[in-house]
């Protein structure tokens, strides 16, 4: 009986010790994880949906730069399943106020959503306003769907 009680106390003590170690490990891991840059222009590929014209593309942009962008356009390259560029086009994202999220949709004629395997922001031909020159430098891309989105 005494051995069972000692064993139970030992197990309980071990669980308490383990529980006190793991939160510290999680905090250390979080401290080491890379943070998103403070001065960033985040552009997310949010959705691709078939449309009557071709493919409706939805993007979410967040301007974390130190200033607003009065007008911006992105040159996008669309890749197919052979990793070949199918189309290059320029999309006008209009203005991106500082600290604000904006949703932009583009109906791409003669593009089949299912044929798009990757999208690349090749350039920012227009980046006007106080943040001019920072658009490509601060660009951070991500995709909410299975199609990779790179910058």
Q: Can you say where each PLM-predicted feature lies in the sequence?
A:
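Bacterial N-terminal signal peptides that target proteins for export
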Residues: 1-11
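Bacterial N-terminal signal peptides
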Residues: 10-20
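Sec/Tat signal peptide C-region and signal peptidase I cleavage site
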Residues: 21-26
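Low-complexity, acidic Ser/Thr/Pro/Gly-rich terminal tails and inter-domain linkers that flank the onset
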Residues: 27-54, 58-60, 138-140, 144-150
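The feature marks short-to-medium sequence segments in extracytoplasmic or secretory-pathway proteins
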Residues: 62-98
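Short, solvent-exposed, Trp/other aromatic-anchored flexible loops in extracytoplasmic proteins
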Residues: 87-128
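C-terminal structural segments of small proteins and small subunits
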Residues: 126-139
